[in-house]
Amino acid sequence: MAGYLFVHFTGEQKDGEQIYFSVSRDGLHWTDLNNGKPVLYSHIGECGVRDPFPVKNPMNGRYYLIATDLRIEKGEGWQAAQERGSRDIIIWESEDLVHWEKERSHTVGIREAGCVWAPEAVFDEEEQAFLVFFASKVKCDGEETAKHRIYAAYTKDFVTFSDTFLYMERCLLYTSDAADD
């Protein structure tokens, strides 16, 4: 079937913070796969995922799916998730978008980060690597309160990553919000 794949989570209910797939031929009418049940589960970290982002490696054709390691449904709420949440991303890998390797995690958040949320990745031709960027809530020296900043790291294989660095200082939670400015 040629068309669109929608990779998503459904909310904060039981099994809502897992990975669901839906497909569409026209981008308007969608069919849930796997009878509307999660296609992928996270059994590591917080045992829940949000903000899934699929990406294809242009060098070898492999697919990667990265997501926020977060489970609000069983946790202490949003405030705790921002201040004491996971600093990991959850990663799945596939050759065909059907068969997926067991999930793994990687710590990309800096030591001072209260969370790592909404990871996305783009392939940087110049670096011949993926730039993985994400929001982290960090309190910097001289600040009264922590704020979300965008950090990033490079990876060629989603196994080893460069050191994490501050990518964008603007107060954004999702980098797609920057398009509105």
Q: Would you name each region that the model predicts?
A:
Residues 68-86, 137-144:
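Short, conserved, GDST-rich strand-edge loop motifs in beta-rich repeat architectures
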Residues 30-42, 99-109, 157-170:
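Blade-edge beta-strand/turn elements of extracellular beta-propeller
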Residues 102-124, 134-141, 146-151, 167:
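Asp-box/WD-like beta-propeller blade repeats and closely related beta-sheet repeat scaffolds
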Residues 21-23, 88-95, 151-155:
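Beta-propeller blade signature
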Residues 174-181:
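Conserved small/polar residues in nucleotide/adenosyl-binding loops
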Residues 2-5, 61-65, 127-132:
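Entry beta-strands of beta-propeller and related beta-repeat scaffolds
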Residues 42-49, 110-116, 173:
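Short glycine-/Asp-/Thr-/Trp-enriched loop segments that recur within the blades
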Residues 50-53, 117-120, 176:
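Beta-propeller and closely related beta-sheet repeat lectin domains
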